[in-house]
């Protein structure tokens, strides 16, 4: 009896698989969300200023934010410095 059920199950699975391949899958396009956070507003303002700088001239001077900027602490100075004792023991 079990041997007779196996071909029937295989045929049902084959028909189901064929049906799944034949039906097109609807693709939902992802809508761009509007963001109301301060970070997003800042990024949008920065993008606007960058795009409009070609027409209006340089609005913002470039800032030096690289790894070798003035005022950056070197790790050698930090390691050689004495620890601060805020709490007396």
From Swiss-Prot:
Keyword Disulfide bond: yes
Record-linked Pfam families: Calc_CGRP_IAPP
Annotated compartments: Secreted
Keyword annotations from UniProtKB, A to Z: Amidation, Amyloid, Cleavage on pair of basic residues, Disulfide bond, Hormone, Secreted, Signal
Signal peptide start-end: 1-22
GO BP terms, alphabetized: amylin receptor signaling pathway
Domain of life: Eukaryota
Annotated propeptide span(s): 23-31, 74-89
Record family assignment: Belongs to the calcitonin family.
Record remark on domains: The mature protein is largely unstructured in the absence of a cognate ligand, and has a strong tendency to form fibrillar aggregates.
Quaternary assembly: Can form homodimers. Interacts with IDE and INS. Interaction with INS inhibits homodimerization and fibril formation.
The name this protein goes by in its record: Islet amyloid polypeptide
